[in-house]
Amino acid sequence: VTDLDALQELLGPHTYPAHLALDGMHGTALPPLADHHVHLHLIDEAELAPHGIAAVVDLGGNPVALAHRLSSIPRVAYAGAFLTAPGGYPSGRPWAPEGIWREVRSPSDALGAPGGAATLVDEQAEFGASVIKVSLNAAAGPVLDAATLTAIVARAHERGMFVVAHVEGPGMARLAIEHGVDVLAHAPFSEPVEHDLIVRAVATRQRWISTLDIHAGDDRQRAATNLAAFADAGGTVLYGTDLGNGDRAPGVSAGELRALQDAGVRGPELIGTLTDPWPAQEPPHGVATFVPGPPPEAVDGIPEWLATARVVPREELAPDTH
């Protein structure tokens, strides 16, 4: 019999022992889990739910293809195309087919202005995007200037959309934080983030998506150090893997969870990075997470244990609590 208080102290208040009604398998139930940074055109999304992921956020894809998806599990929120400076990242990348980026040529807020900030935000919104993805990658080409970034953020907020930024290169984290970007697509990895910027990011309720495990060497260390400082200051961290970048299996990543734990995001806070429904207000309805077998005895066992999770219909779960 699992001690409910001990289980919830380890994994959070919405966790409980349960079994599958159809075959009697015992395990642990949790809310639906989300990967907040994927690229669906580079992965087999059918593999996500059997490996624990009930919701994803696609942060850069063809808005036409994304708009024509059928509603299913995993639930998909998306940004549509990257908005970038002329000649900027990710244009020309072998993994970035035509149609997944738009070049913003002016900060114009005039409706329908060719290449204008408002026009391109509106295009993504009309294709059903709930977030806007901007590229601020000074390490790989031109970047949006402050006026254009400000115009994109303003138009997106008018449309009720979050703005997510890829920040890479000198000064890019500062540019994003000082100009109202809501979410960083990666914990900043190319330079240390100064304390004043961490404080400002937390004060403005910015979120950072982890993606620690895609890095190695100095980039990984900088990302982990920056994320640890952000989390320690009270910042909101979201679990994300940049799935599709490199050869990673779909599903809950033990490597990403271990990296988060090493950065000080542990226990219920770690689970919270996965169960946060952002950008939605609520998690997917009608499904839950089931992890077969006994739960871990300590926080260090969570990553490998949670990597065996699967998505199940909520009606198939029977609580074991008494």
Predicted regions and their residues:
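Short acidic active-site motifs
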Residues: 43-45, 119-120, 171-173, 193-197, ...
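Short beta-strand/loop segments at the ligand-binding rim of alpha/beta enzyme cores
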Residues: 27-28, 32, 152-164
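Divalent-metal coordination cores built from histidine and acidic residues
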Residues: 46-137, 141-157, 208-211
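Hydrophobic faces of well-ordered beta-strands that scaffold small-molecule active sites
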Residues: 32-38, 56-58, 76-80, 132-134, ...
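Glycine-enriched alpha-helix->loop->beta-strand junction motifs that scaffold or abut catalytic
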Residues: 52-53, 128, 177-184, 202-208, ...
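Acidic (Asp/Glu)-rich catalytic clusters
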Residues: 69-73, 125-128, 196-204, 228-234
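His/Asp/Glu-enriched, well-ordered alpha-helical/loop segment
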Residues: 222-298, 302-306, 310-320
